[in-house]
Swiss-Prot record:
Binding site for N-formimidoyl-L-glutamate: Y137, N314, G316
Protein name as it appears in the record: Imidazolonepropionase
HAMAP family according to UniProt: HutI
Gene Ontology cellular-component terms listed: cytoplasm
Function: Catalyzes the hydrolytic cleavage of the carbon-nitrogen bond in imidazolone-5-propanoate to yield N-formimidoyl-L-glutamate. It is the third step in the universal histidine degradation pathway.
GO molecular function, one term: imidazolonepropionase activity
Pathway annotation from the record: Amino-acid degradation; L-histidine degradation into L-glutamate; N-formimidoyl-L-glutamate from L-histidine: step 3/3
Localization in the cell: Cytoplasm
Entry binding sites for 4-imidazolone-5-propanoate: R79, Y137, H164, Q228, T317
Species: Paenarthrobacter aurescens (strain TC1)
């Protein structure tokens, strides 16, 4: 997902420019200038400077591009039979991961690359401009390394998820040793993050702690799948290891909420200054597909926890890349305001990936908000305001998309 462009572009007559900057500005009759890959200026249309190219937004809304901080794009096959069984009343368990692992191992590098590339294109066509993807359907050294290498060529952020499930026939402790040793070494050149599925039927608290400790010692940022199927140790582990995010968070005790809120006590939401805490990443499309309770996004926000929304595209529990669907669900079912939901799907995702601030972090500009110096990732709607995302559920409202200053839709 890379492109360059050195010309300047001026977009005027923006009906609503939802910046998602630290001031939460929403500008009316606005304009924005893109130079190369960065935002060079934004303000009122009447004050707009000249540029090489001029685009009239005709009153449409412009948002930051979606930042999808949780997906599983490196896979082959599907699990429609599992979905149908679940809709008929069977409960979700993590066992279907093994089905996808077999299908993924069976395809060539070229075919797996094509599949990932097609999924990225689908996401971009709906306004996603920054994408994370995990490994986790290889589950041996060779195939996890292959998944990481392919993902690194196609998405913005790669997360190592060898600790997704213990493969059939493997000893859990021996497999955890593999995840913490040779498999970790094999993926390191391609990944920035490590994750663990800390849940019944997957990895125990002690096994998860070993995985997180090994990944931290290897210099990787940390993420946790936790509290999806019931209350458990996932949130506490994420807090203990200062993980960037804990994802799913469907079942939270009061203690879990307080612990997450405590990680944000030293961070100023008005300026972004101070020590960041652990983001709670909500995955509403997954919750609907698995018929789990929706994550308590409203409660988390009210407690002072920063949240993200992500699509969790995967073949078993959330086969969608539609961030707009997640925003709609957050507004209609999770009781977030439109502004809160859009912020969680843009700035919140950037926060969960450590890409929310600074103009040069590992060679990447800040994403998830619209401000001078940030990467020019824009999502223009076929509507005058972001409210239409929830007001008109299911309607494809993406009009135009710019990624790193290049118009891609």
């Amino acid at each position: 997902m890379s492109a360059t462009n050195s010309a300047s572009t001026l977009i005027t007559n923006i009906g609503e420019l939802m910046t998602q900057d630290m001031e939460h500005r929403v500008l009316k009759d606005a304009a924005i200038v893109i130079e190369g890959e960065r935002i060079a200026w934004l303000g009122s249309t009447k004050d707009a400077p000249a540029a090489d190219e001029n685009i009239d937004a005709q009153g449409r809304a412009v948002l930051p591009g979606w930042v999808d901080s949780h997906s599983h794009l490196v896979f082959a096959g599907d699990r429609t039979a599992e979905f149908e069984a679940r809709m008929a009343g069977e409960s979700y368990s993590a066992g279907g991961i093994a089905v996808t692992t077999g299908a993924t191992r069976s395809v060539s590098d070229d075919e797996l690359t094509r599949l990932v590339r097609d999924r990225v294109a689908e996401a971009v066509s709906q306004g996603t401009t920054y994408l994370e993807s995990k490994t986790g359907y290889g589950l041996d050294v060779e195939n996890e390394a292959r998944s990481a290498r392919i993902a690194a060529a196609e998405v913005d952020e790669v997360t190592y998820l060898g600790a997704h499930l213990v493969p059939d026939g493997s000893d859990p402790e021996e497999y955890t040793d593999l995840v913490c040793g040779p498999m970790l070494d094999a993926v390191l050149p391609h990944v920035r993050w490590a994750d663990v599925f800390c849940e019944r039927g997957a990895f125990t608290e002690d096994q998860s702690r070993r995985v997180l400790r090994a990944a931290r010692d290897a210099g990787l940022g940390l993420r946790v799948h936790g509290n999806q199927l019931g209350e458990g140790p996932g949130v506490a582990l994420a807090v203990e290891f200062a993980a960037a995010s804990v994802d799913h968070v469907n079942y939270l005790s009061d203690k879990d909420v307080l612990a997450l809120a405590g990680t944000w006590a030293g961070w100023d939401p008005a300026t972004g200054a101070g020590t960041k805490g652990t983001v709670a990443t909500c995955l509403p499309a997954c919750d609907l597909s698995t018929r789990q309770p929706l994550a308590p996004g409203r409660e988390l926000i009210d407690a002072g926890v920063q949240i993200a929304l992500a699509a969790n595209c995967n073949p078993g529990t959330s086969y969608t890349s539609s961030m707009a669907f997640c925003v709609t669900t957050a507004v209609l079912q999770m009781h977030l305001s439109v502004h809160e939901a859009v912020r969680a799907a843009t700035y919140g995702g950037a926060l969960a990936l450590g890409r929310e601030s600074g103009n040069d972090v590992d060679g990447e500009r800040a994403v998830g908000s619209l401000a001078v110096g940030h990467r020019a990732d824009l999502h223009m709607l076929k509507a005058p305001s972001a409210t239409h995302l929830a007001y008109r559920p299911g309607i494809p409202l993406t009009g135009s998309v710019w990624r790193a200053g290049v118009r891609v839709v």
